[in-house]
Amino acid sequence: MDTRALAEEPEPGEVGPRATVNPRLFRRAPRATLAPDGEVTVRFAVTRAVPAASLYYGTEVPEDPFALARLRRVSSELSIEDGAHTLRFDLRRLLRAKYDVGRVLERGVGVLRWRVEALDPTHGTTRVHDGRTAFSCTPTPCTEDSELVQLPTVVLGPFVDRVDHESATLSFETDVPTAALVAARSEGGRVRQGRSPIGTWHEIRLTGLRSGVRYRYLPLVVDGRGRIAEGRSATFSTWPAPDEDTRLTFAVLSDSRSGLGTADEQYAGTNRQVLWDLMLGALREGARFTVFVGDLIDGYRSHAGAVRYELRAWQKAIEPVGASMPIYEAMGNHEALIEYWTPGWAIGAVSPTSMEALFAERFVNPDNGPTAAEGAPPYDENVYSFDAGPAHLAVINSNYFWRSHFWRDDHPAAGRGFGEGWVDDAQLEWLDADLAAARERGQRHLFVFTHEPGFPNGGHVSDGMWWEGRHPEMLAQRDRLFRLLARHGVAAIFHGDEHNYSRTRVHDGLVDGLERPLWQVISGGAGAPYYAQERGVPWASDVRAFDARQHFVLVEIDGDDARARVVSRTGETLDRFDLTDAR
């Protein structure tokens, strides 16, 4: 489905049948099995014809955690067996001294990295899927006569989230049900451990950590056969104690859905190539954490499995950085699991699951948001807040329970859902109390994040919270939000949605009754197709900066001072400004 159909106006009373939208290519994701003789078989099922596919593979280099997989050989002998597409290769071809970068022969264990690249003639492109498979040799050290054993594998992660001065949450996924343990230790410190019950998705909270200390951690998993394997080791730093935490650097970016070009720019709904460069750039710049303000994926799908697949691909894209730097995710309009009726009606699904519930299932964010009404999607982990040093950050959802054509009474879901850009009353009441409490705790710098811009500048002037001024109730709710921000002294609100960078001064000439000006910052340059500036908006003279280059925003706080620097994908500084002085 072309999402432009959702912007068309159906004829009055014109409601067609429900339809499936945007099925993914891989109906069953590629999965590898390893035979004792070293033969690896990768099988997958598809939703449409795949005339050709290749399988690239290599062993993991343990000393290179921030590098993308380096692949050494290829197999292209595609066959169809029992309805599944099948590719095979001999792992022993990699277990030769000249290829043994992972020292598998010596250690007796290794991790195989592999990629399926399938031709999708329907769309004239290729689709890729990346995997990993842990294995061991019996006996050790490996020889040509050793038996190869497939081990339980950490196939996604680990990720570090919800870090503070004394705790952190580690999460990861395994290919089979496992019990899991994470061990963490600082230099010269005690080992801290956390455990997770049997399952494939593990979230483990480590407590009793020391403040301002770097920890190295290691996931360990054991399957039902008693086979034990390690996940990837990584490091993270706890935050300084609140009374010592006066300096802070964090990054903001959004809109990494598919671009145009290579398979990695259309990586299961994500522009992996650009996203990876920007995330690594933020880490190099010293960001303690990142806030990602929505449109992670292409979305707009009618099957929960297709949305899960895209969210998982996004996690795969940020995986190496996410092992060491917490990433706080927000929902955008493309995070959409929908019910769809021709010729263009849609609403966010609620049963058997919702996009909001899937979001909480895949990500680890604070869960201190408002309580949803009965029968409505949850706010859990898509509306939340947290303190970081002298700052307080609040994330709200301007695409909560999204519905197309919200102004139409003949919508098949009339009376349910909200329009794109609407921040509902429950969120505004929660945000009001949350910001007031942050001020009472003495937090000096307040920031709010939501995907839809109040004052769009390039690409989304026909929606966002503006809708070209066509919907007075939307404008009134927008102004209510901005008055609330100003009343609490919020320094800036960060948005995405538009695939560019802009900085706009919002003042009482734009919002009646605004107590003080503040910055609106749009940072949507993480890989989605570009938009140019549109200068016909009423606030064009208040736009202080605009740039179409891919980028992230770096917020740097030192005591009472807070400044922002906009950094391009190539490391150039595109803009600098004082967050405490919106003029």
Question: PLM ranges: what are they?
Answer:
Residues 247, 251-254, 258-285, 292, ...:
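Internal alpha/beta domain cores that form substrate/cofactor-binding pockets in large enzymes
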Residues 1-264, 283-284, 443-446, 548, ...:
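Acidic, histidine-bearing metal-coordination/catalytic regions of metal-dependent phosphoesterases
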Residues 172, 176, 286-297, 301, ...:
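Active-site beta-strand/loop signature of hydrolases that rely on acidic residues for catalysis
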Residues 252-254, 289-295, 323-333, 396, ...:
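Active-site neighborhood of phospho(di)ester-bond hydrolases with catalytic His/Asp-centered motifs
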